[in-house]
């Protein structure tokens, strides 16, 4: 691989687990790391411990919430980008900062890999004008990228996951042959998070206090999965949807604390009092927090005819393995978090495909010899169930495919292996650095952004006491 001078913006839990590890596999490291001044000690200690010879630059905390970088920071970055001859940048900050850095980097012609969500306006659950910003900011960045011919990649690993690639190939081929769209699709995801009332109000990593939640966290991946699975580019123009209709419901922290009240927490954690937290509840402190769960029915239409009906069931309040009050040091992956993921997709009378992927153990249990991680409950459990109308399309009437069989055996045997999802992230990173990405370009997320915008507009309506229905023309 040709010399890459990589700027890493944000060295948090995700960047350490995905980007530092992924770059090491390629024999690379970031030449420059930028983070908040409040993280200076942690960043320097990590770089020293892992022998990463990166230069560092630390910025004031007030920069993290700006829509555009301050003139001073822009000048500092101009100097650093030139001095280090930066060719590639990875944005792995808290999402509120994404927009400012993207607006700075794209006009410079620096190839960018950004974490999801692409941008993250605050208070999108409560203010219509903020929810609309999701689409406006995306359109602005798309225009910038087009104008400056700057490659921008979004880290959405399911676009690179060989298991989902296998499914999209089946779906795409069938749509092309019969010109029949995906008829029904159901997607379920539960991320296994379980937060105390205090954590909901204080978290900075995957926060809720800024008026956004699940949809900007792991939920983005599954809205994007729905967009990807529709394979709209394979439909003839006259069947391609031109309108989205969405109706939703959401479960907020105040809803959860009504159900999981003070006696509940006292029972499970044996703590004498949660008076402070539940006084905050009575004062309405939790009312404007972001959503924990989101459920929605979506209809994609063409000339008022239904093309596809989709349901989303995206949870942060579902099954978890956490059974302790004091959070673990690693709250990202080792705090009781387990994933349940399923998809059910039907193409008329021709085909039904189901995905089943259910964990019961945590990442920290990967090396436990008592687990077969490819079985139900294991970290890598993933099955594809396929049902075919053989009289029309041929093939096997029923087929069960183990997800692991779609990967080379060497992947799981690699000492650096930490899961197939992460192997897909590695592939995204490698394609980005090689300049060969064509699966998760900024422009590929247009439909995802439409759905995301409509979802938050629906949440706003519900919180304003209105019927949570949104009708939106598709761009």
Which residues does each PLM region occupy?
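C-terminal helical cap and adjacent loop that interface with cofactors, partners, or active-site loops
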Residues: 329-475
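A contiguous active-site-proximal alpha/beta segment in oxidoreductase catalytic domains
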Residues: 120-197, 212
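A short helix->loop->beta-strand "cap" motif at the edges of active sites that frequently abuts
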Residues: 108-111, 147-150, 304
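Short helix/strand-capping hinge loops at secondary-structure junctions
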Residues: 109, 115-118
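Rossmann-like dinucleotide-binding domain that binds NAD(P)(H)
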Residues: 199-362, 443-447
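N-terminal glycine-/serine-/threonine-rich beta1-alpha1-beta2 phosphate-ribose binding loop
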Residues: 1-108, 122-139, 474
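Receiver (REC) domain switch-region micro-motif
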Residues: 89-90, 112, 185
